[in-house]
A protein has these predicted regions:
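Extreme N-terminal starter segment of soluble prokaryotic enzymes
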Residues: 1-3, 261-262
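Conserved N-terminal subdomain of the carbohydrate kinase-like
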Residues: 2-3, 11-114, 130
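Short, glycine-rich nucleotide/cofactor-binding loops
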Residues: 6, 32-40, 123-124, 265-276
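Active-site metal-binding loops of divalent metal-dependent hydrolases
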Residues: 8-9, 120, 215, 268-269, ...
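Short internal beta-strands
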Residues: 61-63, 142-146, 161, 182, ...
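Conserved phosphate-binding/catalytic region of the ribokinase-like
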Residues: 110-111, 126-143, 147-155, 168-260
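Short, conserved phosphate/pyrophosphate- and ester-handling motifs at nucleotide-, phospho-/glycolipid
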Residues: 162, 213-214, 273
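Nucleotidyltransferase catalytic core that binds NTPs
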Residues: 231, 255-386
Length: 386
């Protein structure tokens, strides 16, 4: 699938330095001694940069740099001192809109599955309604990151306002279109094709919120191009935005930031010992999420005999959940975890010891990685000493 990005291109300029004294010229303001500076893409360009870096076939409508806003942030010793915005006022807004629309009229929208309108109200999307009509006529779905009232985006397939922007909308007007409402401190609320989704946002240490919305949008559209269902697209978007805010300055997502690589392993884990812990830690290093299939008490008895397990399934599950590198522990009652493996659909299944990959249950579902067990550590040996 191919994506087109149209919108306000912003250049985010960061000036870094240190402060040791106040400005001797007065005003009780800090004197910043510059050490270095960098310029990053922002606005519509950041959406395009993220999508491209995630491997999406993506184009952007460029326009004269003279009409693009530059946001300069002065940062001293890790703290923002001020932000200076530069542009050319109403003239630039007018000229940007005219140039973008003239270019858009020559675009064959049938080449694109999705068109993203990234609106920062800087003029590039002056003709947003006309652009949406052109895209719709070619069967291209329009997704809008808005900066204004609904009337500017009539006909869009989906609108992604933040909470403040959503309050400006009359929901009687947008009742028949898809929406995603984001807010840093609240769950993401989405309504797509008549289904409502509510996704929690896990707390993270926030370094900078600049560009988080652009990363969210890019990650969501990335999911669409991969053919994922809407819930998974939203989960990816939340994950992408959460990753972005943990970095200073605008951040460009890497594939590993949005795609989870699920690792699965299974066992009884009756008496948790060092061998287990090192094996599980090695398993987690192969991906981003470690899921353990834990044999139920009845399953353990069938495998190990009536004297086992020593610890019941709830205690064994809780012990595994306490390990920082374990993400999920699922109890299964069958003799093998095959049905659970098919349900989870992991990328990798790990097994310890001298197994051959072709003998491991689930080898038809995922790749198999055999990890060495730590010598002289086993539950059987521990039990024999009791």
């Amino acid at each position: 699938m191919r994506v087109l990005v149209i919108g306000d291109i912003i250049r985010d300029r960061y000036v870094y330095g240190s402060t040791e004294r106040l400005n001797p010229e007065g005003g009780a303001v800090p004197l910043v001694r510059q050490t270095y500076e960098e310029t990053k893409l922002g606005g519509a360009a950041l959406v395009w940069d993220n999508l491209t870096n995630l491997g999406v076939d993506c184009d952007i409508v460029e326009y004269d740099k003279r009409f693009q806003d530059v946001k300069t942030r002065i940062i001293s010793d890790g703290h923002y001192i001020c932000r200076v915005d530069s542009g050319f006022g109403d003239v630039a807004v007018y000229l940007a809109g005219e140039e973008v629309y003239n270019k858009v009229k020559a675009i064959d929208f049938s080449r694109y599955s999705y068109c993203i309108l990234s609106d920062y109200d800087k003029g590039a999307l002056t003709y947003s309604k006309e652009i949406i009509k052109l895209a719709n006529a070619a069967g291209c779905k329009v997704i809008v990151d808005p900066k204004g009232t609904y009337e500017r985006y009539v006909g869009a397939w989906l609108i992604k306002p933040n909470k403040l922007e959503a309050n400006k909308f009359n929901y009687n007007d947008i009742d028949n279109i898809n929406t995603i409402t984001t807010n840093a401190e609240s769950p993401v609320v989405a309504r797509i094709d008549g289904v409502t989704y509510l996704l929690p946002v896990d707390p993270v240490e926030v370094a900078d919120v600049t560009g988080a919305g652009d990363c969210f949008l890019a990650a969501f559209v990335y999911g669409l191009t991969k053919g994922y269902d809407y819930r998974k697209c939203l989960e990816i978007a939340v994950r992408g935005a959460s990753t972005a805010v943990q970095h200073r300055g605008t951040y460009v997502l890497e594939p590993e930031d949005v795609e989870q690589k699920i690792i699965f392993t299974n066992g009884c884990f009756d008496i948790l010992h060092r061998g287990h812990i090192e094996y599980l830690e090695s398993s987690k290093k192969l991906g981003t999420k470690l899921v353990i299939g834990l044999n139920s008490d009845d399953s353990v008895k069938r495998l190990k005999g009536e004297s086992r397990p020593i610890n019941n399934q709830e205690d064994r599950q809780r012990a595994l959940q306490s390990l920082r590198f374990v993400d999920e522990v699922v109890i299964f009652d069958e003799d093998t975890p095959y049905n659970l493996i098919k349900q989870i659909n992991p990328d990798i299944i790990t097994k310890g010891g001298d197994y051959k990959p072709e003998d491991v249950i689930g080898n038809d579902v995922a790749d198999i990685v055999i990890l060495p067990y730590k010598e002289n550590y086993s539950t059987t040996n521990i039990v024999s000493k009791l």
